[in-house]
């Protein structure tokens, strides 16, 4: 799961339901008050097959966007996050040029992502065009042996 920096919203990925559930979060007198406010699909089809699974979910550094990988369908979904309501709107769900995207890493600039593709043994890189709703592949994929996860860290200024 992921949560907003202000602590008001929780984003929970349901792998086999192929969905992201959005919750509000408030502190209560005795216990937290958590309320589901949205269920949104992670796939591009209305009836994805049973072999599709929502594998990984990441949030951009500025928390304006959420990304989710879909294994089986071999796509990445990109969502715009409303900072006031917490609700998500799908911008795109596009192929990643690899098989079984197990993770997605967001570059510090928030305009590039890397898809970690387990079954094809590759890492694919994309520029995200938020305005047009596109993932544009940036060069060739890098071969790696059965990758599972990835982190991209900014070093220096």
At which residue positions do the language-model features occur?
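Internal helix-turn-beta structural module
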Residues: 112-149
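Conserved beta-strand positions in repeat-built beta-propeller and related beta-rich domains
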Residues: 4, 12-15, 68-71, 115-118
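C-terminal hydrophobic structural anchor segments
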Residues: 77-127
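Acidic, glycine-rich loop-and-beta core segments that form the ion-binding/anion-interacting portion
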Residues: 1-43
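Beta-rich, blade/repeat-based domains predominating
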Residues: 1-9, 42-62, 97-112, 144-157
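Loop/turn residues immediately N-terminal
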Residues: 17-18, 74, 120-121
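A short beta-strand motif characteristic of beta-propeller blades
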Residues: 38-47, 89-95, 138-141
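Short loop/turn segments immediately following beta-strands, especially the blade-tip
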Residues: 23-33, 79-86, 127-134
């Amino acid at each position: 799961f992921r949560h907003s920096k202000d602590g008001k919203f929780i984003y929970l990925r349901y792998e086999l339901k192929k969905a992201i559930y959005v919750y509000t979060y408030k502190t209560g007198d005795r216990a937290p008050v958590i309320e589901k406010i949205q269920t949104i699909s992670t796939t591009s089809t209305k009836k994805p097959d049973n072999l599709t699974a929502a594998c990984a979910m990441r949030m951009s550094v500025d928390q304006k966007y959420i990304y989710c990988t879909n294994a089986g369908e071999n796509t990445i979904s990109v969502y715009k996050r409303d900072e006031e309501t917490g609700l998500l709107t799908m911008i795109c769900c596009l192929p990643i040029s690899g098989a079984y995207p197990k993770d997605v890493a967001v570059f510090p600039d928030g305009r590039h992502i890397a898809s970690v593709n387990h079954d094809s043994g590759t890492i694919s890189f994309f520029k995200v065009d938020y305005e047009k709703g596109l993932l544009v592949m940036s060069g060739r994929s890098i071969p790696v042996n059965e990758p599972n996860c990835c982190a991209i860290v900014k070093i220096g200024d």
